[in-house]
């Protein structure tokens, strides 16, 4: 009976995280056998330049926008404002360009804004050239 009385009168113990003797639990996610990143294996070949045909290196950068993806607006010519002369040039009024909306540049039509041929929605095809 004395043993049960001493158990009920003891103060509550601190949480297990505050005890120095509590074991530390660490959980790790299981490693998947299938990686998201694929590895590419390459094989070394002999450096035989005579067997290789010299191919012309084609630039994939867009020639119209020079790889920028945007060209100067054709409507406002890069001003951002379409200006109109009134009273024989004495008064000039302008409104925001409707094509570029004042940004002074529009997307390149050749590369569709990608900056290189064969990007995004381009219809560039190697076999056609």
Swiss-Prot record:
Give the location in the cell. Answer: Plastid, Chloroplast stroma
Q: Annotated Gene Ontology MF terms?
A: protein folding chaperone; zinc ion binding
Zinc finger intervals, CR-type: 49-123
Any single Gene Ontology cellular-component annotation: chloroplast stroma
Instruction: Check the record and name the PANTHER family matching this protein.
Output: PLASTID TRANSCRIPTIONALLY ACTIVE PROTEIN, PROTEIN BUNDLE SHEATH DEFECTIVE 2, CHLOROPLASTIC
The record's comment on protein family reads:
Belongs to the BSD2 chaperone family.
Spell out the protein name for this chain.
Protein BUNDLE SHEATH DEFECTIVE 2, chloroplastic
Instruction: State the species of origin.
Output: Zea mays
